[in-house]
Amino acid sequence: MNEKLRILFSFLCFFYVLLVSPSQSNGQDISLSCGASEPAVDQDKKKWEPDTKFLKTPNTVHAPATYQDPSLLSTVPYMTSRIFTAPATYEIPVKGDKRHMLRLHFYPSTYTGLNILDSYFSVAANDLTLLSNFSAAITCQALTQAYLVREYSLAPSEKDVLSIIFTPSDKHPKAFAFINGIEVIPMPELFDTASLVGFSDQTSDTKTANLQTMFRLNVGGQDIPGSQDSGGLTRTWYNDAPYIFSAGLGVTLQASNNFRIDYQKMPVSTAPADVYKTARSQGPNGDINMKSNLTWMFQVDTNFTYIMRLHFCEFQLAKINQKVFNIFINNRTAQGDTNPADILGWTGGKGIPTYKDYAIYVDANTGGGGEEISLQMTPSTFGQPEYYDSQLNGLEIFKIDTMKNLAGPNPKPSPMQANEDVKKDFQGDKRITAFVIGSAGGVAAVLFCALCFTMYQRKRKFSGSDSHTSSWLPIYGNSHTSATKSTISGKSNNGSHLSNLAAGLCRRFSLSEIKHGTHNFDESNVIGVGGFGKVYKGVIDGGTKVAIKKSNPNSEQGLNEFETEIELLSRLRHKHLVSLIGYCDEGGEMCLIYDYMSLGTLREHLYNTKRPQLTWKRRLEIAIGAARGLHYLHTGAKYTIIHRDVKTTNILLDENWVAKVSDFGLSKTGPNMNGGHVTTVVKGSFGYLDPEYFRRQQLTEKSDVYSFGVVLFEVLCARPALNPSLSKEQVSLGDWAMNCKRKGTLEDIIDPNLKGKINPECLKKFADTAEKCLSDSGLDRPTMGDVLWNLEFALQLQETADGSRHRTPSNGGGSVDLGGGGGGVTVNISAGESDLGDDLSSEENSGIFSQIVNPKGR
């Protein structure tokens, strides 16, 4: 009995030592909620402890945030902060011979007595500079995020203590530093050497390097929250859609749910299995693939070397030399010529993942995109492979430290941010809170340890899996991204009628600014009239051209639509959505301020116009751009967003003919792609209105698809959606076009300027797509992803017929996906079979796949 008591006493003393001695907690994950007074749990069930016992600097300030941004899904650790007006140090015990992951969490909100725009500071980890003269407020504005995570991978050192030093800038008289959360996680050594791109015989040593995570993407798949990461590293993997460049989006591939990933060549902690179960490829048509590529673009800081880690796993093919492709990074060959990429050649079998590391130096003196890293993949003909295609499953980009420095400059503020008058006097917080931890001795401490241990074990038994999405925002973005959304102010003033939610999302203009920019709403500046009111051309901030939509007091669209547009559009940033700069709600006036679209609306270029006629190829590119914007609304945001007023006057064109969807006053958030609907009062524009929605008052994203089908016929036929002057059967363009399509007389009603200029196969694909959009039942209509795929295919057919070698780049770019991650055409791989969905007929499927399997068929 005495022996059992001795063992129990030793066991409890061991846990007592772990509790009261920070120096013995090395090797464990540490998550600090800075400024908190007690432990807390975030929405991913991660435990955060107060930071006091690791803080070695007295007289610091802890301050709660006074405003909670709506996008802040978890209050922990962001609603508390630690403020420093002088240099301060955290000392965290670590194992010096191990690599550690360090995450710093910043929420540049309003803290009592402080102006967040005064916050400029540096952060160092031991002798490594992480941030220098850093402004979290400016950075979050540029990235249009409410909060920010900076993640680093720190190389092993000889020190058993990680010192994290915060130093307010001496360049700003009122400067202070702040931090909301700190994570330190021991990690396995996942880095070795990387091939230096462009120099076949040189490598870059990453085993001893300190790294900053710039991008971490699940290519072709959905976001993977930290709670579902492998190896306990709690990394978040984001969908790659926002970084795809050019018109070729490819298709996404997905393995079956029971497909097994075999980590025989690398540790499980390299990446979770879900990364290797999805991929993006160029698509099923090898002939088209040979004339195109998959391209991703990333903005980075210059004068650093970057490691691009590409993750691969083949889950469809089984033989070497079936799919071989080239890889180019910044137009330099990483894999190609006589040494192309062959996933099965690297791994030796299906379901075996691998990765390749490539190093590239980004020089500020290169010019012409020197702040970007591009990744391109094209099929290779080397060895006459069976398929002409390329594939990528995952991607990570890391910045390597230069002379113990990882810091880049702050983003360059846009003109709107630079002139925004939100400065306040820095008053400082005189309250200095000290959190003292005392240690109890003897039996009380042992019993306390035993109680904590028992509760911990019981909680472990009953804790289930967590299905919540991680609240952490992306860590990507460089120091040169610019945007206009403000995440600093929480409320509007001066008699604003807006809700706090809408008021805190973007810049608020004074009425005097708006009147000055429009010459007191001079009628000569009117460039359009809509349901909300007149649209004026204006100038702000000394020269920036904008479009200002001014409400009409007699309009049916009032405050609700005004708030809806602010709340929805200010959260969204996409190449094919018009950008909201700000609003004015003063003196009884309601105005919305947008980027100026110099080429006006799509309708202005189709009929009743003196403008030059659009070519068919340009019309296709505009339709593709608009489809991308709608597709992003349906699939790219947290919730499905249904536009509800898709028409040619709500598709705007910038100076480069890039199409942008506009006017979100009637938009609704939908049922998040679960096949449900939203019951709502019917709103929209006659001629474009979904008849099923009109009958049942049940709104789905397929209502937008119907409206877009009318837009497609409007693009083809160059006539209004409704024309009461025509005979009864011709009044509605949708009905008339469908009738002609069924009779085989569609060519009789297309725009006379296009006759003889459209490739017949392209016309058939385009018309079939528009016809499916106008199906009476929403269930029979394609998704916007399917529509986008078909329009891309139609463009390829037209370009092939025209003998075009390259796509017109003016409408390139985009941030949407054709597959499961971002929606659209997903090629679901199961038992070696591919399903392209209903958007292609069985005859078309057969033709395309026969071309792939037999290269001679190309």
UniProtKB/Swiss-Prot annotation:
E.C. code: 2.7.11.1
Topology feature Extracellular, residues: 28-431
Any matching Pfam family: PK_Tyr_Ser-Thr
Protein keywords: ATP-binding, Cell membrane, Fertilization, Glycoprotein, Kinase, Membrane, Nucleotide-binding, Serine/threonine-protein kinase, Signal, Transferase, Transmembrane, Transmembrane helix
Residues in the signal sequence: 1-27
Membrane topology: Single-pass type I membrane protein
Cellular location(s): Cell membrane
Domain Protein kinase: 521-794
Record's function text: Receptor-like protein kinase that controls pollen tube behavior by directing rupture at proper timing to release the sperm cell.
Additional facts recorded: Male paralog of FERONIA, a female factor expressed in synergid cells that controls pollen tube behavior. Named Anxur after the husband of the Etruscan goddess of fertility Feronia.
Family recorded in the similarity comment: Belongs to the protein kinase superfamily. Ser/Thr protein kinase family.
Protein name: Receptor-like protein kinase ANXUR2
Species this protein is from: Arabidopsis thaliana (Mouse-ear cress)
Lineage per the UniProt record: Eukaryota, Viridiplantae, Streptophyta, Embryophyta, Tracheophyta
